[in-house]
Amino acid sequence: MKRSTKTTDKKLAQKLADRFEEESRGKRTATQARRILSDIYRSLSGEELPTMTVREYLTAFVNRKRPEVAPATLAYYEGHARRFMGWLDAKADTDLAEITAKDITAYRNHHATTAGPRTTNNTVKAIRGFFAAAKKDGYLIDDPAAAVDTVRDRSESNRRPFTLDELRAVMAAADEEWRSMVRFGLYTGQRLSDIASLTWQNIDTARNEIRLTTRKTGRRQTLPLPAALQSHLTTMQAGDDPKSPLHPRAARILEKTGTATKLSLAFAGILESAGLRTAASAGADHARTRHELSFHSLRHTATSLLKDAGVPQSVVMDYIGHDSPDVSHGYTHSGREALEKAAAAFPAI
């Protein structure tokens, strides 16, 4: 078995390889192998093999990313690092090499009991990123996260749009902020995290349009405001700070957690109150049940309403936004007039 010795001294490297081969002929765990290698490295080079605890490495990783990435991406890293360390508890202060694929699989399965498959898989990908970076930085011999698979996701095929009667029931069950978020979700077709991220800076009342960059794909969207949304905006308090959020409570939750998971669960509670989910499915079984209706269904509803109104498919795709970040290089191609006609096709709720 070939293994890097992390040294440019050829003689030392050969000695390390020979000693490691000799010491590891018996069955040993990855942790034992790491300790053997550390002892050999110290005896032959007089130096300690580079090590870091999970907490030290993840803290350093986040700090390294701080000047490199957007605030939303940084919040994503911070949130996943914090939750993983919280779950590890005391083990977060042990060497990175002590973490095994079994540990990460257990974390994945724990996460899957309270979140859906997409959120769980997003977590797996984040953890994979942490450990791949740690291996690249020389703190790991093997990457335990690389052996951990994602969970199966069949939720998309079960989703459907809301009916207008169901939307009215949701509006009746929601509080003022959630009613506003439902309106924005329906009339723009954007995802929950993008709606929660909106600030007054995104709204141009002079041109009656909303401008945003989606968190998932980085797509730049400039959309005419439907009449119903224009009317709704006149009832909202803008304040003096253009960077203040349209939906303060949701924005705080998103900023604190880095994901829309808690917001999704809160919306599930609204659906329960509206009689569109059972009480059991809004609890522990939520993550395991493939629901037909969620906040994302507003995106499907917007698509269906536009298609039913005769809006061309290409305009619908531009208005709602492509899923791929590579499509159109982040820009819409439909003209302003076509998008305005699409916006005018929405009914009031």
Could you describe each region identified by the protein language model?
Residues 169-170, 221-227, 231-236, 330-349:
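DNA/chromatin major-groove-contacting recognition/catalytic segments
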Residues 8-10, 161, 214-218, 320-345:
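Catalytic-site neighborhood detector that most strongly recognizes the C-terminal catalytic loop/helix
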Residues 117, 121-123, 136, 140-192, ...:
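Basic, Lys/Arg- and aromatic-enriched nucleic-acid-binding interface segment
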